[in-house]
Amino acid sequence: MKAFPETFLWGGATAANQVEGAWQEDGKGISTSDLQPHGVMGKMEPRILGKENIKDVAIDFYHRYPEDIALFAEMGFTCLRISIAWARIFPQGDEVEPNEAGLAFYDRLFDEMAQAGIKPLVTLSHYEMPYGLVKNYGGWANRAVIDHFEHYARTVFTRYQHRVALWLTFNEINMSLHAPFTGVGLAEESGEAEVYQAIHHQLVASARAVKACHSLLPEAKIGNMLLGGLVYPLTCQPQDMLQAMEENRRWMFFGDVQARGQYPGYMQRFFRDHNITIEMTESDAEDLKHTVDFISFSYYMTGCVSHDESINKNAQGNILNMIPNPHLKSSEWGWQIDPVGLRVLLNTLWDRYQKPLFIVENGLGAKDSVEADGSIQDDYRIAYLNDHLVQVNEAIADGVDIMGYTSRGPIDLVSASHSQMSKRYGFIYVDRDDNGEGSLTRTRKKSFGWYAEVIKTRGLSLKKITIKAP
């Protein structure tokens, strides 16, 4: 195995609503995430004063970021993915003037990262938007939200033009099909046509952000971000293969629009077959031509699908309810572990788009135990990440252009799916439980030193295979 390229970016990935806390400090408004105490798959709940959402404090990154950045630098990070909390900058979402205190926080954060030699990779909207845009406009179903997002994007592009050179528009934009409130601010019972119209507005907003970035920051790069993970046919029956193709297209269509600049023919047929009419203006079509510079994605699992709907309906155990693959092991949360699938996905996306790729989320959520001596022996996490990084290296050898890898997450954080601290991802243990109890003390896990060595050796310390099939 050859060393990873010298230009390869190594780091970790976080999100504002999973780490920052300080949910109403310094003028921040209420976001949609603040109304989802049970995670991205949970429904919107009215805010009950006095009842804490674990994300209100999260891991208190808002106040403790210097300590965390120092730990990331100790591991040798060259990149850290963060998101800007939109409601920190525009509390209601439709203000003309931004909240200076919110902007100043990210000034301080980016300065701290610069001093540590860590490049920021910044997501504009990571599973949240100002709740004011949902309450007063109806979320992304309203075309007016496009303009408010563009105003927000231009504001932060201008403010951080000398601090940030890598941007992402929407986190896992294709997740809106599974969690409409999380993705586009719509009620869970919204109809399919309404969801796709809201998605269209978001795709236009993403393209406008790309256009603005290219205009204001000619040296910067801006990408999209997809929830990645291939769907395999359950059997070799042609009908299962066709079903798998259609399921993969359901999420790849977002990348097709963002990377190719127009709706693909298969989606035109899908809309016809389902009696969906997308209201699209001529200016929308022009805006969509502003395509991303690179493709970024998360990768946690793969799954199977069958043409037999009775089998599909009985699928359970993971966030997307795919049929389990009998040849793969699963995590404690039912997410199937498929390192080879990452190599296949990287080659698939490279063949499809011929644009640089960036793995901006990948990791193992697990229940860690603190030993009597205070150590955390997370060999299972090391094995998981080792095997995935080996496959990334194989994809590079295949000729795939890969910009970097940011593990999810570099430090324990509030998990997105169900708002749990017990579902731990980090190289750094944070003393906090699902009830919000704990000192928030940071402790290096065994994987901390392992990842530092991987970065130092540019991957030459990786072992070929550590996870065997069941």
Which residue stretches match the model-derived regions?
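Catalytic domains of carbohydrate-active enzymes, especially glycoside hydrolases
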Residues: 60, 64-85, 119, 290-294
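Active-site mouth loops of central-metabolism enzymes
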Residues: 50-64, 141-143
